[in-house]
């Protein structure tokens, strides 16, 4: 058992509750086993219409409207405020171990993956590389020959997924073990669970493939949404469940063995006069917080539900375009105004940090010693204290945003920027 992991960057059955959350049961079912058989812009989650395509100017507007904070500020936007002055200084908070600048641009959702002492990365040109975690040296590389959606890795298996639905299982050294072909495009990185490889297609299908040979164990299809994000919310697993964020602010818990839904819940209700105003997809990966599963919806709410049955624990009207982070006690959100807030169970705000507005803050991650790590659109990594939200340290990686949240491994973090820089940072 390896614990919880996330992959590396989205007309319902709602019954409104007084607190703004809603529940639905019995509207989703597992399908029989299926046979195994779009390059986005540099933005975190380009919105796209589903198979029931929107026509005219709405469809064009959807294709051009990203959710990334960068997109909210054109060239004529006001400059962001000066960075908060670090309280301690860079050398005491985090330290750059190495940088590898030999890659090409990385799409949003391209996250490094760890396998033993190696770090696997992919880039927009379809190049796959295995780097040494010690110094960033290239140990092995090859061209995938097609557009990549993402990868996942552990000490036993590396899985590479192409956007056309080709899934390849590799050894930790890069030798191909198996290949499976899906009948749909993929825009999200896979997830490696102890017992299966989990892949999500752009049409809302979740498939569990055998780790040993790539055959399909089960397939489950979400109800079709008229409008949804091109890049789906990453999936999260625990011992026997996979949690999936869906359009219309829904969360579903699937049995990892059979793909049968255990529960599903909508954490927000769709409001607004237009399709874009009613868009409330889950943003970022859901996070496990003790015995709760927490998530945030774009133009919606942040909420936590019980993992056992999906019952609402708490909910608050607070939107985000990047996502949340959590540990067993606290939840951190970058709200729609890019104010960073720490929330306690129940949704109350402990502190607010507004020194990073208009900087395109990434999804944060919680690192050892109760600190918060995140990037911004100017290529900087910042480290905050979770006790009071004060800035502890900041270092520059390059001049572009992160492709995904930082990847943690003990007291080290690995990042990949949209310009292709791979960097290792010591958090001590």
Functional labels for PLM-detected ranges:
Residues 119-120, 158-159, 197-198, 242-243, ...:
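Conserved beta-propeller blade signature
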């Amino acid at each position: 058992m390896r614990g919880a992991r996330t992959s590396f960057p989205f007309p319902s059955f709602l019954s409104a509750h007084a607190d703004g959350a809603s529940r639905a049961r019995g509207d989703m079912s597992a399908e029989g086993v299926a046979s195994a058989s779009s390059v986005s812009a540099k933005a975190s989650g380009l919105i796209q219409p589903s198979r029931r395509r929107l026509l005219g100017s709405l469809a064009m507007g959807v294709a051009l409207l990203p959710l990334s904070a960068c997109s909210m500020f054109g060239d004529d936007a006001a400059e962001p405020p000066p960075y908060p002055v670090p309280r301690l200084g860079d050398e005491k908070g985090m330290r750059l171990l190495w940088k590898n600048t030999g890659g090409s641009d990385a799409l949003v959702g391209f996250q490094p993956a760890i396998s033993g002492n190696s770090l696997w990365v992919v880039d927009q040109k379809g190049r796959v590389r295995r780097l040494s975690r010690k110094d960033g040296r290239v140990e092995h590389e090859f061209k995938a020959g097609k557009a990549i959606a993402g990868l996942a890795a552990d000490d036993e298996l590396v899985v590479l997924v192409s956007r056309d639905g080709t899934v390849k299982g590799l050894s930790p050294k890069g030798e191909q073990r198996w290949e499976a072909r899906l009948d749909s495009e993929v825009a999200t990185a896979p997830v490696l669970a102890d017992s299966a490889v989990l892949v999500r297609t752009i049409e809302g299908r979740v498939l569990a493939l055998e780790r040993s040979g790539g055959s399909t164990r089960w397939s489950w299809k979400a109800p079709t949404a008229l409008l949804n994000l091109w890049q789906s919310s990453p999936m999260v697993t625990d011992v026997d469940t996979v949690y999936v964020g869906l359009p219309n602010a829904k969360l579903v818990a699937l049995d990892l063995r059979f793909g049968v839904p255990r529960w599903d819940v909508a954490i927000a209700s769709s409001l607004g006069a237009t399709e874009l105003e009613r868009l409330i997809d889950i943003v970022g990966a859901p996070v496990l917080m003790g015995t709760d599963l927490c998530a945030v919806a774009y133009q919606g709410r942040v909420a936590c539900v019980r993992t056992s049955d999906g019952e609402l624990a708490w909910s608050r009207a607070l939107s985000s375009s990047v996502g949340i982070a959590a540990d067993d006690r606290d939840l951190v959100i970058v709200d729609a105004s890019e104010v960073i807030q720490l929330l306690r169970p129940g949704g109350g705000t402990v502190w607010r940090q507004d020194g990073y507005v208009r900087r395109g803050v990434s999804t944060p991650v919680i690192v050892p010693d109760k600190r918060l790590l995140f990037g911004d659109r100017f290529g900087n990594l910042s480290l905050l204290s979770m006790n009071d939200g004060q800035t502890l340290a900041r270092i520059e990686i390059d001049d572009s945003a992160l492709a995904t949240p930082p990847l943690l491994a003990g007291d080290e973090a690995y990042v990949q920027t949209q310009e292709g820089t791979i960097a290792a940072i010591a958090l001590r």
